[in-house]
Curated annotation (Swiss-Prot):
Sequence ranges of Basic and acidic residues compositional bias: 251-264
Pfam families: Aminotran_5
InterPro entries (UniProt xref): Aminotrans_V_dom (IPR000192), Aminotrans_V_PyrdxlP_BS (IPR020578), PyrdxlP-dep_Trfase (IPR015424), PyrdxlP-dep_Trfase_major (IPR015421), PyrdxlP-dep_Trfase_small (IPR015422)
Matching PANTHER family: HERCYNYLCYSTEINE SULFOXIDE LYASE, L-CYSTEINE DESULFHYDRASE
BP GO annotations: antibiotic biosynthetic process
Pathway: Antibiotic biosynthesis; cephalosporin C biosynthesis
Name of the protein: Isopenicillin N epimerase
UniProt similarity note: Belongs to the class-V pyridoxal-phosphate-dependent aminotransferase family.
Length: 398
């Protein structure tokens, strides 16, 4: 697509013209067709019981089928969730009783902090040990190095492997299929944090040999906040036990059905999703989010994102000590580019300066191995916005 076409596509996204938004990795803005779909809430407000009982079920099943098709999954194995945090906590509380004391939970050393805490809590309750494997750092030549680091850390006591498909702080893309294959060969349960993956990379969950995969829609897919999902392997559905007891619960203990029911789900999925009366309208907007990017071409969108990421790397690398930590290898990177900031950087001052003086929304992260600047480039971003960031960094360094 030519620049004019991308500019026209940008016009369809709800962006504040006063803000430079380089932060889809935290939360993406809504395309107007997606926002318009969320206004289905008006129908719920006008007739709540008619909407929830009669109108919602077919809409919910359609949304599930569309998301499943987009992810390469089967709809009966795909539970909606509010976000990845909730989905992973559901998995953790469900598998906890099945993890024998004395075993180990293996994580990468770059996991999102609340997810690490989640597994540390499981370990405390079950008498397990949490171990980490160190992800290789720049220069990182190939995905083989990641696989070697993970497999070297797996041992006879490893019971569960948890890792991010795309590392949230650096944008490093892990070879998820190969990691899950290695774990499966060793009888290790796999749970993948896919918060950054939908819309960021091409997904085929049916071909990914993991036991549980949790993802978000509010980042790169540009779906509303409140859209998450949990995909589970066929032999893992019976393990899942939601913390809440609501409609869908089977007091008789019988295995719930995986056939579509009249509620827009299956008996098993209803048990996982139902929390009493709640607003499911964000889930119903998923088809609109998929359609919007399909209209632009999913492949072309990802190509544009990578093009902007490459421009960002070239424009900012080496300037005043900025060092890219995201690999350049196409199999290990995508649309997020992280830069190591010079030692001693006042991260709070830089963060506030970028926003207060220049209205640039971009994360400045504090990490044990040094501060980072993380730049997310979606199709609606422009080279001019990256230049604006470069000029702001120059001004703030004076």
């Amino acid at each position: 697509m030519v620049a004019t076409a991308w500019a026209n596509a940008r016009e369809q996204v709800s962006l504040d013209p006063a803000v430079t938004n380089l932060n889809a990795g935290s939360c993406g803005p809504l395309p107007r067709p997606v926002f318009d779909r969320v206004t289905v809430r008006a129908r719920m407000a006008a007739g709540p019981m008619d909407f929830l009982s009669r109108q919602l079920p077919p809409l919910l099943w359609t949304a599930r089928e569309r998301l499943a098709g987009y992810l390469g999954a089967r709809p009966e194995r795909l539970a909606f969730a509010t976000n990845v945090t909730g989905a992973v906590n559901l998995v953790a509380s469900s598998v906890q009783p099945h993890l024998a004391a004395g075993g180990e939970i293996l994580l990468s050393d770059q996991e999102y902090a609340p997810m690490r805490w989640c597994w540390e809590r499981v370990a405390r309750h079950q008498g397990l040990v949490v171990r980490t494997f160190r992800l290789p750092v720049q220069p990182l030549g190939s995905p083989d190095e990641v696989v070697e680091a993970a497999t070297a850390a797996m041992g006879p006591r490893t019971r569960l492997l948890f890792f991010s498909h795309v590392v949230s702080s650096t944008g490093l893309v892990l070879p998820a299929t190969r990691l899950c294959e290695e774990a499966r060969r060793r009888g290790v349960l796999t749970v993948v944090d896919g918060a950054q993956a939908p819309g960021f990379t091409d997904l085929d969950l049916a071909a990914l040999p993991c036991d549980y995969y949790a993802g978000s829609g509010h980042k790169w897919l540009l779906a509303p906040t409140g859209v998450g999902f949990l995909h589970f392997a066929e032999d893992q559905g019976g393990v899942l036990r939601p913390p809440q007891v609501s409609w869908g619960y089977r007091p008789d203990g019988e295995n719930p059905s995986d056939e579509r029911n009249r509620f827009g789900s299956t008996d098993r999925l209803r048990n996982l999703e139902c929390e009493g009366t709640r607003d499911l309208c964000p889930w119903l907007a998923v088809p609109s989010a998929i359609d919007f990017q399909a209209g632009l071409g999913h492949g072309r969108v990802r190509e544009r994102m990578r093009e902007l990421a490459a421009f960002t790397r070239e424009r900012l690398s080496g300037w005043r000590g900025l060092e890219p930590v995201t690999p350049a290898h196409p199999g290990l990177s995508g649309a997020m580019t992280a830069f190591r900031l010079p030692p001693g950087t006042d991260t709070a001052g830089l963060r506030h300066g970028l926003w207060d003086r220049f209205r640039i929304d971009v994360p400045v992260l504090d990490r044990p191995d040094g501060p980072l600047l993380r730049v997310s480039t979606h199709f609606y971003n422009t080279e001019t916005e990256v230049e604006r960031l470069a000029e702001a960094l120059k001004e703030l360094s004076k």
